[in-house]
Each structure stands twice: as C-alpha cells, then as structure tokens.
Amino acid sequence: MRKNMIMIGAGMMLALASCDKTEIREITEDRVVPQPVDTIKVADHFYLDGHLSRTAEDLGGRPLDAANLFNDGEELYVANFAGKCVDVFDAETLEFKRSMSNGDRTLARDVYAEGDHLFVAAGENQEVQIFDRKTGKYLSRLGTGSWPASMISKVGCVCATPRLVFVRDSKYTNIRVFDREALNLGAANNNKVFAKLSTGGDFIGSSNEPLGESYDMEVIGDSLYAFIPRTGTIYSWKVEDIIQQKDYAPLKVSRSQEFKLRSISKTGDKDKFFVSMLKDGKIQLAEYSLADFQARNFANPLRCFTADDRVLLPSQTIIAYQKEKLILTNGAKLDRWDIRNNPAYEIKPR
C-alpha cells in the first residue's frame, strides 16, 4: 500500500509540473515610476518668424508701392500708389486676386472697406473714389476732383462706418464727414459735407504730415481715432456725438513724445488691437487691450515685437493683423510675419 501511495504522489507532482508553465526570473532592469507634478507657471515667449514678401513680380511686373492697406479677414486691400489702383490679395495666403481702379485717376493713398463699398483716397486727384466692393466697379466719388470747388483736396486718409465716411486731407485743418445715407452713387460727384471735425493746426501736407507718408484713422469701440505719428498726437471723437452734434462733437486730444502711434489694426478679438508705433526711437508692433488703448496706457503691451538681427521693420509701416500673422506695408513690397510662441514651463512635484 505504501508503495502505491508513493507512486500516486509522484504521479500527481509530475502532472502538476507538466501544467505549470510559470518561469521565475530575476529582474535587474531599472523601474521608473511616474511622479505626479504640477505646472506652476507658463512663461510665453512670442517672436516673429516665417517671413513672406509680395513684390511687383507677384503682380505680373506691375509697379507696387504699398501706401496703405485694409484687411477684412478674407481679403486684403492694398492702396498701390505707383500702380494707380487697389490690389486685392487673399488675406490668409497673400495670393494676388484682382485689381480695381478708375483709369489713371486712382492715385491710391489709403483704402477702407465697409459694407458693400470700397473707399479709396485718391491722393492729388482731390477725391475719394467709391467702388462696388464685390465687382470692383467704379460708382462715384466724394468731392469733385478739382480745386477749389471740391470739399476734398489732396487726400491721405479715409475711414468709414455703416453711416459715415471720414476724410483727412490737405484742404483744411479738420476731418470732413460725409453722410452715406445722403450719397447719390449714380451722380458724378458727392460734395455735401455732413460735419467738420477740427484737428487743431494739423493737416496732411503740413510739416508734421508730409504728403508722401502714410496715415491712419480707425473706429475703435465707440470712437473715431486719427493719428499724427510725428508728434505723437491722437484725436478722438465718439461716433454718436458726431451724428448728433456734427461740428460741435466733443474732441479728446492726447500727445506723447514717448509713444508715437502710426496705425492700428483690429484683431479677431474685439477687445484686443495691434498698433505700429515709434518708441524710444525704434519701431514697435504692439498688442493692447481695448481698455489700455482707450486710456492711452501704452507702457505695458500684451505682446510687443521690435526689430533685431533677423527681423527688419519698416520705419513708416501700416499694420494689419490676420490670424497670428502681421502684414506690413514696406514701400515696394508687402511683408508678412508669423507670430510664434516658444513657452517655458516651471513645474514642481506634488
């Protein structure tokens, strides 16, 4: 019996051994156990990169002198003074799309799109030309195109709202305001002025505002702003005050020798804006909140870019923002820079 039990026990052990495939090994590799951490601080480092230019070559060899521009988010309108036209580019790719002009009269110094219409300040031709924004057809003009009858002289700057058109030129020391509801786009001329907004002793063509330079006006928030870059002067009026009080709309004037703004661009955020300005003798492209801009608080921009050994910035540039890209006028070319970020992270274990 005992012999049989021993044989049965040995058989069971052999059967169990044949079923157990587990191998036992000594593991010597290092084991890393992830340790939870917290991000304490993210320090953004924004910079300009990815430069792109457009020149006369992109226009088929036609002259390019980018005096001013306007971006509606889909199309970029460029006042091409040398080309005597407005050139239209795709705002995202900067591919050339089409041109519009009224013969040789479109000596474009500025351009502004609002609603169905495009307004073009036609320089020494003493008129603001009005085009159909979609078809490019010339419709009419503000002024008469001849001195002294025209209420518009050598034009350097134009801006518009759904109700009004604002014009700065060399005729008077004021901004001429035209009522869009009173315009007759089937007429040759529209010469009736709705209001005149005083700009002190400043006018385009004066020693502080040479005719050959570029200027900007824009409606930001509820107000119209006009910039005199050489003196650091900013004029502003509330648009509703202009409609209600016309010539007597209250004026706000600020002057700064430290911050001299030349142009401003809206962004995709109604509470943020980019400006081109002169600070400490250097051109800066800076982003500000609406509140800081309205308060003329330019000391602490949200983001700021200056020229360096990689980035060259034009001295009198007009700026347009397009989805984290900055488009700049630069004489015989358009420049575009991408805004990029290389953030740094400060972390610690939990």
PLM feature spans:
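C-terminal motif of bacterial Sec signal peptides marking the signal peptidase cleavage site
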Residues: A15-S18
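Beta-strand-rich domains and repeat architectures in extracellular enzymes and scaffolds
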Residues: T55-K84, T106
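Conserved beta-strand positions in repeat-built beta-propeller and related beta-rich domains
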Residues: V78-G83, V120-Q126, V167-K171, A226-T231, ...
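Blade-level signature of beta-propeller repeat domains, shared across WD40, Kelch, NHL, RCC1
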Residues: V311-R350
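Short coil/turn segments that connect the beta-strands within blades of beta-propeller domains
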Residues: G73-E74, G115-H117, P162-L164, G221-S223, ...
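Repeated scaffold domains used in trafficking and secretory/extracellular systems
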Residues: P63-N68, T106-Y112, S150-V158, N208-V219, ...
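Surface-exposed loop and turn segments in beta-propeller and other repeat-based domains
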Residues: V32-G61, M100-D104, S140-S150, A187-P210, ...
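Short loop/turn segments that connect beta-strands within beta-propeller blades
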Residues: F89-L94, D132-G136, D179-L183, K238-I243, ...
